[in-house]
UniProtKB/Swiss-Prot annotation:
Required during biogenesis of c-type cytochromes (cytochrome c6 and cytochrome f) at the step of heme attachment. Belongs to the CcmF/CycK/Ccl1/NrfE/CcsA family. This is Cytochrome c biogenesis protein CcsA. It is a multi-pass membrane protein. GO terms for molecular function: heme binding. May interact with ccs1.
């Protein structure tokens, strides 16, 4: 009987059912990932469930695309799941580079919060699909919005990795040899003989996480830059102006400046250790305000609607 109802709902409401399945699998994955941290050993089960979650979100978004007839990123519900998809994908890519139990343990709670917000907090009218206004019926929708959302995912992952570096080293000095290129990134090389530089240097746990954080933020910054440029071109085509300084645009520019400053301090000034980790961790709040905070204003071309109205 329960299975009959499940499959019946899956046929008639596939987007909602798949969204709930994502929530329950993340809920199962959370204690497993935390247990792996205490055991200090990466869990294959956590990675397997994360892959399943990513595939379920992919299927959910494809169903929504088929039902609505447009790329599924036009309202807050869709964009939240797209963001969760990006973070789960980023988590898997990071774990492919460096397997550490702390990586899923910091990513999965954020994924669960995002999906919970989409499932249980958003009102029904913000979950349902609707026809796009003429200005949004453009191929720029896919290019601009998807790239910006992927930049948010990469920046969030970078911030979470920096938080993990700070957490691991909360009661001890933080000395990190960085992979950041540039003037500051190569200061360490002066203290090593030439022969030693030929051999690979084994990085510590914190250094590996810091390197992954830096790379994630660099990727996110590049994507955010492309998103801002594509958005400006689209705005000029649709409304005849490159930039209107609405709340979302303003905060996106603030986010861009914030991460530009972070990368500048790491690459050119040689920032290492606790300072860049603190700055990158603060970036999580910057992205949160940029993505969700402006919706509470309920104004602007980019607002997904007044959440509690």
């Amino acid at each position: 009987m329960i299975l009959d109802n499940f499959f019946k709902n899956l046929i008639y409401e596939p987007v909602s059912v798949l969204g709930l399945l994502v929530f329950y699998f993340l809920l199962i994955n959370l204690p497993i990932s935390l247990g792996a941290v205490f055991k200090k050993k990466s869990s294959f089960a956590v990675r397997l469930i994360t892959i399943l979650v990513n595939l379920l979100i992919t299927l959910q978004l494809l169903f929504r695309w088929s039902i609505s007839g447009h790329f599924p990123i036009s309202n807050l519900y869709e964009s939240l799941y797209f963001l969760a998809w990006g973070i789960t994908l980023g988590q898997l890519l990071v774990e492919r580079e460096y397997q550490a139990p702390i990586i899923p343990s910091i990513a999965i709670p954020i994924e669960l919060l995002i999906v919970s917000f989409a499932c249980f907090v958003l009102p029904e009218d913000l979950k349902s699909s609707s026809n796009l206004v003429p200005a949004l019926r453009s191929s720029w929708l896919v290019m601009h919005v998807s790239v910006v959302m992927l930049s948010y995912a990469a920046l969030i992952i970078g911030s979470l990795l920096s938080m993990s570096v700070l957490f691991i080293n909360k009661n001890k000095p933080l000395q990190i040899r960085s992979s950041s290129t540039g003037i500051g990134g190569f200061k360490l090389s002066n203290s090593y003989p030439v022969n030693d530089l030929v051999e690979s240097i084994e990085f510590s746990h914190s250094e590996e996480l810091d390197t992954l954080s830096y790379r994630s933020i660099l990727i996110g910054f590049v994507l955010l830059t492309l998103g801002l440029i594509s958005g400006a071109v689209w705005a000029n085509e649709a409304w005849g102006t490159w930039w209107s300084w609405d709340p979302k645009e303003t905060w996106a520019f603030i986010s861009w400046l914030f991460y530009a400053a972070y990368l500048h301090m790491r690459i050119s000034k040689g920032w290492q250790g606790r300072k860049p980790a603190l700055l990158a961790s603060t970036g999580f709040l910057v992205v949160l305000v940029c993505y969700l905070g402006v919706n509470f204003l309920g104004i602007g071309l980019h607002s997904y609607g007044w959440i509690f109205g």
